[in-house]
């Protein structure tokens, strides 16, 4: 593999770091807590004005044509300050899927406006435990969708959703507008305190032109969702561990910094190894996905095992480092007046969203079992 990132990725990551560090102060985060939906429109506007949304978007949607490595760099930087913006959902996943699989009409009608920031798109991939997929019944000139999806990021503020569903001829992904009859979104309270919704489709009608594609689209969305969440998690853990190390250097007990105690130092060292392992596997996965995207549009992607490996590290390291952050900070770690508690919550949210470390290991096992020797 190639460990060297691109110059564009370095530049974009640095620019986003500068923007989010300036905007996402502890005071600003507390102001976001007062909103009905935690969507940082001020930061979103600054990212739009700086060209961040369009920089790594496909040229077919009016973007600059950079790719996965650059998007990963942006997501890591957004994670550093727990940025409450739908870059992952709207630009990377939804607009990316439309650019890769959608018709020219869908690209121009929805993808371009997502990349420009005029519309917010999201993806509805997850159902409640034990719940079947959304069902799409043909109606002659379109489909009627029935079912629910949960944990839809930025669902309460989204203009449209990409929804996988089962049809008579197999799986397909549809674009469903928030204003379509039969579409209802309920806001959810979640661990990460973000804008998350429950999507209910009660016979929502979509015409055939809103069909984005088949099984390959759903597979692509699942792979990119895991990769993107992993990138954001890296940013969260990096900054959270930095804050914890700084606290250990300055907090004194028994007339010496607590970081000088062996047990504390070992805990921080373990966290450092976890974060480095996550960065390594994320880099491998992003590079493989980027190579596959350039080589072919066919799915399933051979990068699946690499992405699941990175997802395992994001969940496992997320659990360990999140608890290290709280434990080393002591009482401060659970004081909501201190910003560090937000990193614990964000890390746990991503861990749960990925299905935990065990879920990713099972995914790797299935891929290995199904791969010919």
Swiss-Prot record:
BP-aspect Gene Ontology terms: cholesterol catabolic process
Keyword Lipid metabolism: yes
Keyword Magnesium: no
Stimuli inducing this protein: Induced by cholesterol and repressed by KstR.
GO MF annotations, alphabetized: acyl-CoA dehydrogenase activity; flavin adenine dinucleotide binding
A family per Pfam: Acyl-CoA_dh_N
Documented activity regulation: Uncompetitively inhibited by high concentration of 3-OCS-CoA.
Top EC class, one word: oxidoreductase
Keywords on record: Cholesterol metabolism, FAD, Flavoprotein, Lipid degradation, Lipid metabolism, Oxidoreductase, Steroid metabolism, Sterol metabolism, Virulence
Pathway as given in its UniProt record: Steroid metabolism; cholesterol degradation
Record field: catalytic activity: (25S)-3-oxocholest-4-en-26-oyl-CoA + A = 3-oxo-cholest-4,24-dien-26-oyl-CoA + AH2
Record's cofactor remark: Binds 1 FAD per heterodimer.
Chain sites annotated for binding FAD: 251, 327, 331
Essential cofactor(s): FAD
EC number annotated for this UniProt entry: 1.3.99.-
Annotated InterPro entries: Acyl-CoA_Oxase/DH_mid-dom_sf, AcylCo_DH-like_C, AcylCo_DH/oxidase_C, AcylCoA_DH/ox_N, AcylCoA_DH/ox_N_sf, AcylCoA_DH/oxidase_NM_dom_sf
UniProt similarity note: Belongs to the acyl-CoA dehydrogenase family.
Subunit structure: Heterotetramer (dimer of heterodimers) composed of FadE26 and FadE27.
Function (record text): Involved in the first cycle of side chain dehydrogenation in the beta-oxidation of cholesterol catabolism. It contributes partly to the virulence by increasing the efficiency of beta-oxidation. Catalyzes the dehydrogenation of acyl-CoA ester side chains of (25S)-3-oxo-cholest-4-en-26-oyl-CoA (3-OCS-CoA) to yield (24E)-3-oxo-cholest-4,24-dien-26-oyl-CoA. Also able to dehydrogenate steroyl-CoA such as 3-oxo-chol-4-en-24-oyl-CoA (3-OCO-CoA) as well as 3-oxo-4-pregnene-20-carboxyl-CoA (3-OPC-CoA). It dehydrogenates only (25S)-OCS-CoA diastereomer.
Name by which UniProt lists this protein: Acyl-CoA dehydrogenase FadE27
Organism: Mycobacterium tuberculosis (strain ATCC 25618 / H37Rv)
